[in-house]
């Protein structure tokens, strides 16, 4: 059985992560989150994120890699695994007009657990944010010398993901895994037109949606040993384009004045409890790696997402297909050493991505570089991880985001099946 101290740790981490997720609704202003499902989260374990998101062929007996569910097969047969992660993010938004905005926030990344059912069957489950929406955009306009108005776009919300995955060893060095996820959350999108003339009518259109749905991701991994030198790894991941549903309400409000001094003149409800169908994309990823278990790993991943097919009730959101290339790896000098430093793990990675956004003919690209360290506790496989990332999103022709992210995680490895020996 699990020791009581680990039960308390897990419970405490769960409460802490849930509180962070609640606060995550007050996310940094991100104008690009206005489109589609919002800003898509990395949905990668810290061990994978610290390698630039390279994880389709990554396996570990002490880490939960939900980027490819086939990796669960490597779990220690006699252990219970738990991994929790949160990040601190600092960013600067720079617009083509020369204006800029800075901010920082704490973000919950995930809480996941894994264990062995049989030697040939391993399972994992957890919760993580799927996407976050938070934006505020003002667009001043002038129609005459004294007649001006402002168009404002603002929204907030987020989608969470609860997943359960299983991996099976079909034959030696080959595993198949499946993650089944349930998505839930809300989106609030608003658009207002306000005139400078206080006697003019202003208008605000609001749309509120509750989102529910499921996604299924399947993955395979195959490793080819090359004598005593290492092994070649091959990985493939496929996410099926299963539609998800939302139920929404919309309102149109006409009013005088602005802010707290506004007086409502009329309110219309054109849509109430209307059900929408979101056509989701097909996502395919593949990876290739070379490494030696518990010693070193170098991999490269490529991901394609068919976001051009994303639509709400057959209405396109002007998205494009996404492409991402990641490369990274880790090095552990000697995980069996009695000294501390050789047992540490050092990670490095980078990625470039053509995101699903194309605005005013400009593709919105992203790149990032990552560094990571894992600090094991003495005489155990439990430990703490630290990963830092610097990246850029967008273009100076529109809005560019420069960001720095520091990610912290705790990884618990508890042997709970082992029987005590009797003298």
Language-model-derived ranges and their functions:
Residues 25-423:
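Subset of outer-membrane beta-barrel
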Residues 1-29, 423:
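Bacterial Sec-dependent N-terminal signal peptides
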